[in-house]
Amino acid sequence: MAARPRSHKISIPNLYCKLDKRTGKVYWQYKHPLSGRFHSLGTDENEAKQVATEANTIIAEQRTRQILSVNERLERMKGRRSDITVTEWLDKYISIQEDRLQHNELRPNSYRQKGKPIRLFREHCGMQHLKDITALDIAEIIDAVKAEGHNRMAQVVRMVLIDVFKEAQHAGHVPPGFNPAQATKQPRNRVNRQRLSLLEWQAIFESVSRRQPYLKCGMLLALVTGQRLGDICNLKFSDIWDDMLHITQEKTGSKLAIPLNLKCDALNITLREVISQCRDAVVSKYLVHYRHTTSQANRGDQVSANTLTTAFKKAKEKCGIKWEQGTAPTFHEQRSLSERLYREQGLDTQKLLGHKSRKMTDRYNDDRGKDWIIVDIKTA
């Protein structure tokens, strides 16, 4: 006589087994809880149990999502929106900013600037509901940044979080006018960095290493054109036509055409002569480029803004001038020096710098107490 089939204790819902009397084999089946249909799983008991467990999990998740979706629709029908957490809203906010970036409604630098404030907000308040955030929560984030000595970044954090809540108002996730970031105090940022004088610029220029000719080109372009660091690094020889250097400013989108005969009287050099110094035996698209292959770049490659900043800092340390800690001028200060030199020549520096307002240009003209004001004692 054939042996009696073993009994199977099945603890997994919707899993069944069936004995085939002809062959003596046990076949496993899974019954779909919604449709009632059976699905064959073969004769491997362990594999059948694993498949049934996974199927139950998937179906349970689907039913949970359906229930939540129905609840959300019911809440909307009642005129209420489900509460959204800070993390959930920040994910949507980032998506909105990416869309603005793709449609040229947001500058790349402005998009990158939002990164740290969003990260800090997520870390500090991520699990809270957006509508429950208070001015105290925002103030704690801002104060933590200020405590690290980054007052300018604290201003950026406040500015970005104000925009986060404005977008949330537009999306209907918080009531109109709800903006706890707006209620916080604007951090003060006292600028300690000194302006760069012409004598200091000349001392730094003379201390540039022979192995870094790109820094001399960058410094000359900065002083003669008055443009920002990123725009100088992006300058190409193909940007020159009609006897002018054409620049589309990365920060503002302003389009400038600077005549090559523009002359900086303080250096007794024209833009045309500076560009001639940028031309060499190395084939490159960029005015500021590597002339020698290094471990990080090949000959002719574009010099990055970070590389130019670091090289300027090293030349500044070698020039022999001592500044108090935290007050040494940066590469960007050449833009202010250029504005002051050209204003003395009588040029329209607002157009040269690409500013939309005279007020912004006047800020660059402020020497921050660097020079003495000579009192005119001549009588009429």
Curated annotation (Swiss-Prot):
Alphabetically ordered keywords of this record: DNA integration, DNA recombination, DNA-binding, Hydrolase, Transferase, Viral genome integration, Virus entry into host cell
Cystine connections: none
Residues covered by the Core-binding (CB) domain: 84-169
Active-site residues from the entry: 228, 251, 332, 335, 355, 364 (o-(3'-phospho-dna)-tyrosine intermediate)
Keyword Nucleotidyltransferase: no
Alphabetical list of Pfam families matching this protein: Arm-DNA-bind_1 (PF09003), Phage_integrase (PF00589)
SUPFAM superfamilies, per the entry: DNA breaking-rejoining enzymes
PROSITE patterns in alphabetical order: CB (PS51900), TYR_RECOMBINASE (PS51898)
One GO term (biological process): DNA recombination
EC number: 2.7.7.-, 3.1.-.-
UniProt cross-references to InterPro entries, sorted A to Z: CB (IPR044068), DNA_brk_join_enz (IPR011010), Integrase-like_cat_sf (IPR013762), Integrase_catalytic (IPR002104), Integrase_lambda-typ_DNA-bd_N (IPR015094), Integrase_recombinase_N (IPR010998), Tyrosine_recombinase_XerCD (IPR050090)
Domain Tyr recombinase: 191-377
Lineage: superkingdom: Viruses
GO MF, one example: DNA binding
Gene3D superfamilies documented for this protein: 1.10.150.130, Classic Zinc Finger (3.30.160.60), Intergrase catalytic core (1.10.443.10)
Function: Integrase is necessary for integration of the phage into the host genome by site-specific recombination. In conjunction with excisionase, integrase is also necessary for excision of the prophage from the host genome.
Entry's family note: Belongs to the 'phage' integrase family.
PANTHER family xref list: PHAGE INTEGRASE-RELATED, PROPHAGE INTEGRASE INTD-RELATED
Protein name per Swiss-Prot or TrEMBL: Integrase
Organism: Enterobacteria phage P21 (Bacteriophage 21)
